[in-house]
Amino acid sequence: MQIVLGGDFNCALAPLDKIGGTSTERKKTVISKIKNLCTNFDLQDVWRSQHPRTSQYTWRNNSLKVQCRLDYWLVSKELSVLVTNSGIVTSTISDHSAITLHLQSREYVQRGPGFRN
């Protein structure tokens, strides 16, 4: 199955993905469900795969001194070989940073002339 799932999952999946704050039972349940989803559908956190020891965060609360990586690209292993890059782009206008994903196409698709011609 070919899956690309991205978004704000509202929890840090690993200790490396969070500084500050506290852990709750509710968060542990959500983390467990996301990890089960990844196992059941053979999904990889591609950013973590590319940056196994890096601490970089996608959400921050400066008043509480908490930073977490809450935003993920989860990609099926079948498609993960097509990932050429993933990244986190710091934002100055939001408490969330953008996450990027670059995939290499398996085949060249020739572009048509478009509707203006």
Language model region names:
Residues 2-4, 66-68, 73, 77-117:
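Surface polyanion/phosphate-binding segment centered on an Asp-His-Pro turn
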Residues 1-75:
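Metal-dependent phosphoesterases centered on the DNase I-like endonuclease/exonuclease/phosphatase
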